[in-house]
């Protein structure tokens, strides 16, 4: 559900403050990039126990340089490999807004559009350094806002106005840094040194009231405004929150839609991540737990980590 349904669609920008300030440029890690065999990522989505349609979509992709050969006199086997090792990963999760037409189409459109934009950022993230970090974040933000405009145009064309809308939470893992872009009430978490950190904040009317001092956090959890989005792609307002932070080898990241956090507490999420054996196992466990407790919404969970060195 979106707030201010009669408001004029607009775009804007903001900087997230969910985590401490990023490491200064001189503090960039010089530790080697993890090898592909060390990376363990997995994503899972489920319609839940109540909803007929799954309006969640997600994507996990590794980032490479690629040479596409159209013709050659050289045997194909002699030309491999033509894809470089991964330079990083991108995680995307989008939750179509209920109560609006084509929530599933909106979330799918956003995933496809952002994936398309990412392919055109190759040169920028390949040469990423402290001096270009702000430019990179600005490019990500621009891609998100252009996708917002795309959804508005689709809504005008298909429905004469109010079309589909969706949340979006995106994590770029580009060693030794991580970048988050966020709209709505999906979420991104990081387990570091055994402590769970929320890297995003919900963009709901209830959360805005809490920040304004008009509502206590305990009241927000029960408030009907807790399900009313103050910001979403394709909605009346789209205000991306962006964050740059450091990445460490012992980090575990988790992205999810609110179908998980409606039924599973942050303490429980932290407990599962602390005892993680594989990204797939923890995704399946958390989705199952949400469904066991009612599964009132679609639920999507993405997890990524660097495997610990074998002893």
What does each model-found stretch correspond to?
Residues 1-311:
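PP2C/PPM-type serine/threonine phosphatase catalytic domain
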